[in-house]
């Protein structure tokens, strides 16, 4: 993996990883893990991949989005729920992944097949990887919700800027 592209990604995330293996795991799709394990003659799960991180990242994302919405002065449970659900949708996460250039910079390690298959699954690959990266940041920061929240605020910057405009100028 290109160290320059990893550095660019860390800059975009606002988090320099102390343990780069956590980031590499977050960027490793199960298809790559399984192929690499089979090459080494190992069991499929011996090569760490993003699946567990995706689950953890999803939970952390939900909690931090709520905190960020409260910080934006969203006052009601209903509004927080609606806005959080919009921000955590796969399409929104895929937009974030596209801004991070996860596929474009070949940062997602995968063995999915040809380019057509990659493009067909691009939304899922990007959104899952964004969630996995959030988990990797959380673990790398010593389970710091504050550090993870700071990074989520940065990578969701355009979405929160748009939200603030809507809150200031409701239609």
Q: PLM features: residue spans?
A:
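Double-stranded RNA-binding/processing signature
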Residues: 1-171
């Amino acid at each position: 993996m290109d160290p320059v592209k990893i550095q660019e990604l860390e800059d975009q995330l606002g988090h320099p990883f102390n343990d780069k293996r956590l980031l590499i795991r977050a960027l490793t799709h199960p298809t790559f893990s399984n192929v690499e394990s089979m090459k080494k003659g190992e069991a499929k799960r011996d090569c760490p991949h993003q699946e567990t991180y995706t689950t953890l990242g999803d939970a952390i994302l939900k909690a931090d989005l709520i905190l960020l919405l409260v910080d934006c002065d969203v006052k009601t449970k209903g509004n927080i729920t609606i806005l959080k659900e919009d921000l955590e949708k796969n399409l929104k996460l895929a937009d974030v992944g596209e801004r991070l250039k996860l596929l474009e910079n070949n940062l997602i390690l995968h063995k999915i097949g040809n380019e057509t298959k990659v493009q067909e699954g691009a939304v899922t690959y990007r959104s899952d990887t964004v969630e996995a990266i959030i988990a990797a940041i959380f673990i790398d920061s010593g389970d710091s919700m504050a550090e993870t929240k700071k990074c989520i605020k940065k990578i969701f910057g355009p979405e929160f800027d748009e939200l603030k405009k809507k809150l200031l100028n409701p239609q």
